[in-house]
Design a protein with these regions (language model features):
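A conserved acidic, glycine/proline-rich C-terminal tail/linker
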Residues: 118-135, 161-165
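Short Gly/Pro-enriched loop/turn and capping motifs at secondary-structure junctions
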Residues: 138-140, 153-156
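Short loop/turn positions at the edges of beta-strands in beta-sheet-rich folds
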Residues: 79-81, 127, 137
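Extended, aromatic/histidine-rich regions of cofactor-dependent oxidoreductases associated
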Residues: 147-149
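Catalytic subdomain that performs nucleotidyl-dependent activation
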Residues: 115
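Electropositive, beta-rich accessory/interaction domains or terminal extensions
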Residues: 1-109, 118, 154-171
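Loop/turn positions that initiate beta-strands
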Residues: 88, 138, 143-145
Length: 171
């Protein structure tokens, strides 16, 4: 894409898909990760974002048409908030298994997508960051698949706690 007079490679524009999608070790089939230095890789193979945040963002940003995938996520889910999910938790979706690795920390590409000068700061301040998953078991996932906790990392921080710790270090 063209942004501020420069050509920028990005995979942040995502669209919902119908039907099953193959989950590989490094990404979902058909997914593009433009900058492997900061996105993707084994510990950031899949980006998950809670659907519950969308209503809040649509109102706050005055973007009523902001649709699923609007934050560059691969999976938009129900019931997996940063307050309950812990770093290290293992999830099963469809025939694939995942492990929660870290919160998503925003970069300028979120600014490209949302086009609000303070979006990176607001994203962190609200704690509505979503989180990355590594792929523990390759398989297939589809819209409507149940999400099950396979194992909980009771000693690990919640994603919200990890975001708060990061934010307090930056202040």
């Amino acid at each position: 894409v063209e942004w501020r007079g420069k050509r920028v490679r990005t995979g942040i524009w995502k669209e919902p898909v119908a039907g099953p999608v193959r989950v590989g070790r490094l990404n979902l089939e058909g997914d593009g990760q433009a900058d492997s230095r900061v996105h993707g890789g084994a510990s950031k193979a899949v980006y998950l974002y809670p659907s519950e945040h969308y209503e809040l963002w649509r109102a706050e940003l005055d973007m009523p048409d902001l649709g699923w995938g609007g934050f560059g996520e691969n999976l938009t889910t129900v019931g997996l908030s940063e307050e309950i999910v812990r770093i290290g938790d293992r999830l099963r979706i469809g025939t694939a298994a995942f492990q929660v690795t870290r919160p998503r920390l925003p970069c300028y590409k979120l600014l490209m997508r949302i086009d609000r000068p303070d979006i990176e700061r607001r994203f962190l301040q609200t704690g509505r960051t979503g989180f990355y998953l590594s792929v523990v078991l390759e398989g297939h996932i589809a819209v409507g698949d149940a999400i099950e906790f396979e194992a909980s990392s009771e000693k690990g921080p919640t994603v919200a706690e990890a975001v708060a710790a990061r934010s307090s270090r930056e202040e």
